[in-house]
Structure formats: structure tokens, C-alpha cells
């Protein structure tokens, strides 16, 4: 009989064998802060237009080369629970605003780094948290006073493109003017009168070859597909959409047929042919000249479609089918029945075209009032086009934010330095120990212009001292000049480097909430990981290809 070994007294004896627990400042708080600092340091070098790219290979061995913090974090699959909280805050920023994810990480990391200094000199966690929350509220009070301009007309392509430039610059520095114009054209063309803009209505089609300057905007949809039949171009298209295969109905039972004469053999499939002919003719008689199907196309059905001059397009993706229905105003039919007028879609032209060496089917609306617009991106490599697509995504999300709130604040670290200056002054007036935390909160804002300066290769301390000097004189819109070879500053409003008010508001709020949540943790209790055999490493999950 095995000897019973008693567990050590204390918290551990209440837990299952193999469970771990950490408590106190040294074991829990400082450990969590260290993990968050490491994560923030990773993405900090990717901040701003001159940020470095990260090469990430995910669990499916897919390669990502990008400086987009949201993509990096999504593919890294962070496991540490405290670092995960900051990752979740950045995901919330992406859902709420669509841009500014790296700001959340860098700012939250700076807040925690400075909180550690305060804790080590003797402040309690509750005093640091209270100071941070007071400072966050103060920052939100100050922020409306820093608004330098507002978007006047969101239906003017030139004005919109100038406002989108900054968000694209951080991903595609050098191509921002061209891309901003493309995105502005796409967004303005489908911006409804109601003012409710849906980002899913801007589609991106990536076609390998040529260069980024060959990219274009189409009002309608583009699919990397070929037509099934002989008809490759239709003007004034009336479109019937089917979610079923374009084929005759067959019984599920199997049967054996005895054929005795040559005449019986000749007439054997004639009934099936006549039925298929009648079905396709009925569709053609409704006026439909384009059929889009979500299933396979039978050879016999294809023959009759060619006979009645019907253009056939097959889309394998049900999402593409839904988007096409939305674009052309059609209803997807589950059975091969003739569509009524209300179920048919319409667009100005459907044609098979060649972009580079890729065949594409284009559903085009000549008038700029279509429900969906497509940006056709060209590029030399897939990774480059993926990165351009992320820049387009940021630009479209910025337009969406501007439809909700047209206010803009100066970029380039100008807003952060002004907030730091004013919150520091406010901290001086606070009597309690919270004033130290309030001042550290203000100091954390310096992390943003510091990251911009370091990534641009100039001395950060010189830049920050110059910014403070200019802001003390009352120039609220002056920020870092990233194009200068020496530490220099310039007016961000004149340079057109502007951030959305909502983006800044939510980034400060979410970063502070994440930092405070991490600081509130004083114990970590981890159950023993579940046992059992590990899944074989060579085989992938059946649904892994969907995540790719």
C-alpha cells in the first residue's frame, strides 16, 4: 500500500494535484506586467509609417509579412492570460473603430510599465488604479478641445481621400495618395442617403501581376471565375440566381432498363432531353439572359443554355452568391424554376474579361448607385497584396467612423503631447497620492511620439523636448515630422495628418481599461492541464482550410 504524503498546508492543499497558484506583487502583478510589456515591445517597432514588418508563420504554415498589429496578434495566438487581456482590448478597438489597434497595445504597455515603477516605490495598487481612472476621465474631457477640424462633405471624393490618407499611410507609406483616392471613390459611390454605411459593401479582388498603380475601382462585383458556356458578354443583363445545381432532377432510386430494339435505345434519353430543353426555354422566356448557379452545371443544361444564348456563371461560395444577389437585386432560388420579374436581378453589363493573365467575370453598374463596389488590387506578390488589402480595410473603416463622427484631431503625436501636458498640469493640482499615478498616465502618452521617432530613426528625447516646447507656446496642432532627417516638428493640420476623434477616444478608453484590469489581478490560479493523448501533428483538422 502506497504511503500517503500529506500536502503542504495553505491554499495549495485545497486544489487538485498539479494545480499552480501565484499571489502577491512579485509573483502575480509584476509577472503580468512583464508579459504585457514584452507584447507591447513586439508591436511597438511596427507603429507608424516607418514601422518595421513582422514575419509571422501561423499554425497552418501560412506566411504573413505585415506591420498591422491586429493581424500579428490574431496569428500569434497569445496564451498568457494577462497579455491576452491587452490583445482582447486591441480586438475591441478593431471592432469598434477598425484602426488604432497598435495604439492600444503601445499605450497599455506604457501604462503598465510606469505602474510598475510606482508600485516599486511604495504606492498601493488601488492608488495607481484610482489615479489612472481619474486621468482617463480627464483625458476624455480634454479631447474635444483638441479637435482641429471636421469633415464637411463626405460625398466629395477629393475631401474624403485627404482624410483617409493618414490611416493608409501607416500600412502603405508612399502609396497613400493613390490608395486613398481609390478607397474614396469606392466609398462615396455607394454611400447611401440614409448615412448608414456598411463596410462589407466594399469588396476587394486581388489579381497577381503588374503593380499597385494598375489597381482600379469598379461599381459592381468582380469574380475570379470563367463563364461556363459560349456566351461571354451580355449588355443590359437580367440575372437569374440559383443556389441549386443547374441540372435536371433525377430520382434517388436506382433502376435497371431492358432495351430490346435500336428504336428504344434512340428514344431512351429523349424524354430527359425534352424536359431539360423545356426548363431552360422557360427561363429564357422570362427574359433572363444570365444565369448564376451555386452548384455544378450539367453538360446537357450547358448545351441548351448555349442554344438560347444564356450566359452561365458558376460561383462555388454561398457568400459570393449572397453578395451578388445584394449587388444586382436578385433572389436566390432553391429550385430550377423560371424566375418571376421580382426575383430577377439587373445590371448594365456582365462580361468575361482578362486582367493580367487571370480570367474574371465582371458584373458592372455604369451608374454610380450600386449597392456594392469592388476595388481590384494588382501587385507583384500575394503577401504585398494582402498588406495592401489591410490598408484598404483601414481606409474603409476610417470612412465608416467619419460617417458616425466627423471630428478630427491632429496626428503625428500632437494630440498625445497636448494631453500629456494638460494632464500633468492637472496632476499638480491633485492633493492625494493619486497625483503620482495621474502624472505617470500623462507620461505614458509620450510612448506614442517616442515610438514614431524611434521607428523613423531620429532621437526620441530631442523630438519630445521640442514638441513640449512648441506646445507650451500654445501650438496644439504641432507634431513629429517623420520625413525630416533630423529631429523636427511641423503643423499636422497643414500637413493633412489627421486622426479620427472616435479612434483616439476609444483607444485611450480601452487601453486604460485593459491596464487597470491587469493591475487588479493579485492571484493567478491555474488548474492542471487536461491529460489524454495529443492529436497527431501531421494531420490537420477538417475545417483548417476554412481558417486559412
Curated annotation (Swiss-Prot):
Mg(2+) binds at residue 99. Belongs to the TCP-1 chaperonin family. NCBIfam families: chap_CCT_theta (TIGR02346). This is T-complex protein 1 subunit theta. Residues 529-548 are annotated as: Disordered. ATP binds at residues 100-102, 170-171, 412, 499, 504. The keyword Metal-binding applies. It comes from Macaca fascicularis. GO terms for molecular function: ATP binding; ATP hydrolysis activity; ATP-dependent protein folding chaperone; unfolded protein binding. ADP binds at residues 47-48, 100-103, 169-171, 412, 499.
